[in-house]
UniProtKB/Swiss-Prot annotation:
Signal peptide limits: none
Enzyme Commission identifier(s): 6.4.1.3
Subunit: The propionyl coenzyme A carboxylase (PCC) complex is composed of three subunits: PccA (biotin carboxylase and biotin-carboxyl carrier), PccB (carboxyltransferase) and PccX.
The name this protein goes by in its record: Propionyl-CoA carboxylase, protein PccX subunit
Lineage: Archaea, Methanobacteriati, Methanobacteriota, Stenosarchaea group, Halobacteria
Length: 88
């Protein structure tokens, strides 16, 4: 995507060195902001129990007959969490 943006970039022929530097700085800042936003979005995609804790607690209740609250620090991998049901 960055290459697409740069290939379409043109600096006017009558731009002096200060104007060209300002254009380059603005484009550089924009690309930096896009990269930072992509990194932040990737960090937000971390798997959590936020949506699944109650579903998993219900499954534990139906299988073991004992309702337990799943701690937020429990492994998000269901197989790993199932091995720790005695600790919940």
């Amino acid at each position: 995507m960055t290459e697409d943006l740069l290939s379409g970039l043109s600096i006017p022929d009558d731009a002096d060195s200060e104007e060209a530097a300002a254009i380059a700085a603005a484009v550089g800042a924009h690309l930096h902001d896009q990269t930072a936003a992509a990194v932040a979005a990737a960090a937000d995609e971390e798997e959590t129990w936020d949506e699944k804790r109650w579903q998993y607690a219900g499954r534990l209740d139906s299988v073991t007959g004992c309702a337990r609250r799943v701690p937020s620090g429990a492994p998000t991998n269901a197989w790993a969490a199932s091995g720790r049901t005695d600790r919940f």
